[in-house]
C-alpha cells in the first residue's frame, strides 16, 4: 500500500496539469497510468496540439510564446476575445453548454496558457493549417493561432519532465479499478498493477483518465447501434472506468451522453490511433469537396463552416451512411489546396480523367447515382460569387438539398480524385458533474463528494452535439489546474 496527499488517475494533459497544480502547493502527489511508458499520455498524445484560448492581440500571444517584433507586426494574428469564444462555444453546442463550466473554461484559458508555459509547455505559431498568405501578408483565421511544439505528444513529454523534476511519483501499467470509499469520503483507489490488485491511499483522488470512446460496449450502449464499428483515433485505454467508479459511489452523471467528437477518418486506418503517424488519417479538407455515400448521394453541407466548427460532428454523419463509409471527391481546381495528409502514405485514393471512370472506380458506390448527383450539384453552384478558401465566401448552391453554403466549386476539371473515409471517434461528451470552482465531483443531490475531483474528458456538461476545434486540450488544462489546486486546498484546510 502506498499513500499520497493527492492521487491523480491518468497521465494525459488534464492529469498532468492537475498533478503539477497540486504539487506546486507542496503536497505529495502520485499518478496512476494504465498504459506502459511508451503508450502513456492518454488521448493527449494523439492530439494535433492546437489551442483555443481567449486573446485580444499579439501582445497576449507574446506572453505565451516568443514572437519576434517584425513577425508580430507583419502578421494579422486574428483574435479570440472572451465574447468571441463564448459566441463560438454556445453556437456550436446549440446553447446547451453549462454556463458555469464554460465561463471557467473561457475566462481562465489565457492565464492557463501562460501557466502551462511556466510548467515547460512550448507553444509556437500555427502557421501550417490556420493561416494564409493574402496580398503578401500572412493572415490567421479560425481563432487559434498557436499550437504545441511537437503536438500533443510534445505537450505530454514536456509536462511529464516537469512533473518528474518536481517529485511527482508516476506508476505505469497501473489501472485504477475502483474507489476506496467509506460512505462519507473517498480514501484512495484499488488498482491492477501488472496483474496484481493493490491499494493506493490518498486524502484526495482526481479522476482524469478520459471518457469511454475506446469501449465498444459503452459506445453502443450510450451513442447507439453502429458505434461499435467506429475507428478510435486515440488511445485504447479510455474505457470509461473513471466514470464508472465514480458513478458506483453515487456521483452525478452529466452532459451529452449520446454525444461525441468524431471526424472523417482514413477509411482503412487501424482500429486505434498510432502515435508515430497520428495525423496521417486526417481528412479535413472536405469543405472543398462533395462527400458521396454508397448511393452516390451527398449527405451533408460540406461548406457549412470552416472545418474547425464542423469536423467533430461530421464523422457521425459518415457512420450513418450505408457501409459506414463515404468518398470525398475533388477536381484539379482545388487539389493544390488540400492538406498534406491527402498526399501521404496509407491513403485510400482513386484518380481518374473522367467522372465516368471515377464513378466506376469508387468501391461500393452507385455509379449512376453519383453522376446524377454531380450533374445536379454543378448546375446548382452559384458561379457569380468569387471563390475564396480563406473566408466564408458565400459561394453556395441553390435549389438542391443538402445545400453547400460556402466554397462550392463545380466538379468539372480533370483529373478527378476521391478519398475514402469512415468515422474516427476522438472522445465522448458525457461524464461527471463537477463544481466549476473546485473541480469536486458532485453527487446525485449536487453536493460535493469529499475527496473526489475530476478533470478532462470525463467532465460532462461542456460539449453538446459539436465542438470548436482546439478546445479540448485547453479544457483539460483549465480544469486540471482547478482540480489540482482544489484538492490541495481542501487538504490544507483540514
What are these regions (language model features)?
Residues 1-14, 30:
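Beta1/beta-strand and adjacent pyrophosphate-binding region of the FAD-binding site
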Residues 24-44:
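Glycine-rich FAD pyrophosphate-binding loop
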Residues 45-80:
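N-terminal glycine-rich dinucleotide-binding loop that anchors FAD/FMN and/or NAD(P) in oxidoreductases
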Residues 72-136, 353-376:
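Rossmann-like flavin
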Residues 99-197, 215-218, 264-268, 381-410:
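Conserved redox-cofactor binding core of oxidoreductases
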Residues 178, 369-466:
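A glycine-rich dinucleotide-binding beta-alpha-beta segment and adjacent secondary-structure elements
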Residues 193-196, 200-269, 439, 470-473, ...:
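Glycine-rich loop(s) and the adjacent beta-strand/alpha-helix scaffold that form part
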Residues 239, 243-365, 369:
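An anion/pyrophosphate-binding glycine-rich loop and adjacent beta-alpha core
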Amino acid at each position: 500500500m502506498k499513500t499520497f496527499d493527492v492521487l491523480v488517475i491518468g497521465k494525459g494533459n488534464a492529469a498532468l496539469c492537475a498533478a503539477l497544480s497540486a504539487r506546486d502547493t507542496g503536497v505529495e502527489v502520485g499518478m496512476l497510468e494504465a498504459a506502459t511508458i511508451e503508450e502513456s499520455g492518454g488521448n493527449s498524445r494523439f492530439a494535433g496540439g492546437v489551442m483555443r484560448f481567449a486573446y485580444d492581440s499579439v501582445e497576449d500571444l507574446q506572453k505565451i510564446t516568443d514572437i519576434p517584433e517584425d513577425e508580430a507586426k507583419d502578421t494579422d494574428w486574428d483574435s479570440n476575445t472572451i465574447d468571441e469564444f463564448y459566441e463560438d462555444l454556445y453556437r456550436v453546442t446549440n446553447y446547451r453548454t453549462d454556463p458555469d463550466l464554460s465561463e471557467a473554461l473561457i475566462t481562465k484559458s489565457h492565464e492557463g496558457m501562460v501557466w502551462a508555459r511556466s510548467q515547460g509547455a512550448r507553444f509556437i505559431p500555427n502557421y501550417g493549417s490556420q493561416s494564409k498568405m493574402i496580398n503578401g501578408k500572412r493572415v490567421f483565421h479560425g481563432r487559434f493561432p498557436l499550437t504545441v511544439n511537437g503536438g500533443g505528444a510534445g505537450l505530454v513529454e514536456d509536462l511529464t519532465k516537469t512533473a518528474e523534476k518536481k517529485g511527482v511519483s508516476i506508476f505505469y501499467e497501473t489501472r485504477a479499478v475502483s474507489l476506496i470509499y467509506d460512505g462519507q469520503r473517498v480514501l484512495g483507489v484499488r488498482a491492477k498493477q501488472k496483474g496484481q490488485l493493490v491499494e493506493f491511499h490518498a486524502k484526495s483522488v482526481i479522476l482524469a483518465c478520459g471518457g469511454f470512446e475506446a469501449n465498444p460496449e459503452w459506445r453502443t450502449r450510450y451513442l447507439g447501434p453502429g458505434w461499435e464499428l467506429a475507428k478510435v483515433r486515440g488511445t485504447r485505454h479510455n474505457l470509461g472506468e473513471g466514470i464508472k467508479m465514480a458513478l458506483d459511489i453515487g456521483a452525478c452523471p452529466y452532459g451529452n451522453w449520446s454525444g461525441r467528437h468524431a471526424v472523417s477518418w482514413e477509411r482503412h486506418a487501424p482500429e486505434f490511433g498510432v502515435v508515430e503517424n497520428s495525423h496521417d488519417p486526417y481528412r479535413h479538407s472536405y469543405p472543398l469537396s462533395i462527400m458521396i455515400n454508397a448511393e452516390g448521394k451527398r449527405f451533408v453541407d460540406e461548406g457549412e463552416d470552416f472545418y474547425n466548427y464542423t469536423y467533430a460532428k461530421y464523422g457521425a454523419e459518415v457512420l450513418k451512411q450505408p457501409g459506414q463509409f463515404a468518398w470525398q471527391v475533388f477536381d484539379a481546381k482545388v487539389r493544390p489546396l488540400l492538406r498534406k495528409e491527402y498526399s501521404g502514405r496509407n491513403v485510400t485514393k482513386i484518380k481518374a480523367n473522367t467522372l465516368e471512370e471515377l464513378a466506376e472506380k469508387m468501391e461500393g458506390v452507385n455509379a449512376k447515382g453519383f453522376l446524377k448527383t454531380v450533374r445536379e450539384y454543378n448546375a446548382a453552384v452559384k458561379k457569380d460569387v468569387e471563390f475564396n478558401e480563406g473566408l466564408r465566401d458565400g459561394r453556395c448552391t441553390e435549389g438542391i438539398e443538402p445545400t453547400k453554403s460556402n466554397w462550392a466549386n463545380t466538379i468539372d476539371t480533370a483529373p478527378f480524385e476521391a478519398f475514402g473515409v469512415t468515422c474516427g471517434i476522438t472522445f465522448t461528451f458525457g461524464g461527471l458533474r463537477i463544481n466549476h470552482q473546485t473541480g469536486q465531483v458532485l453527487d446525485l443531490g449536487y453536493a460535493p463528494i469529499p475527496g473526489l475531483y475530476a478533470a478532462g474528458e470525463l467532465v460532462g456538461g461542456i460539449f453538446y452535439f459539436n465542438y470548436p476545434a482546439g478546445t479540448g486540450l485547453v479544457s483539460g488544462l483549465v480544469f486540471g489546474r482547478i482540480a489540482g489546486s482544489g484538492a490541495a486546498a481542501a487538504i490544507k484546510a483540514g
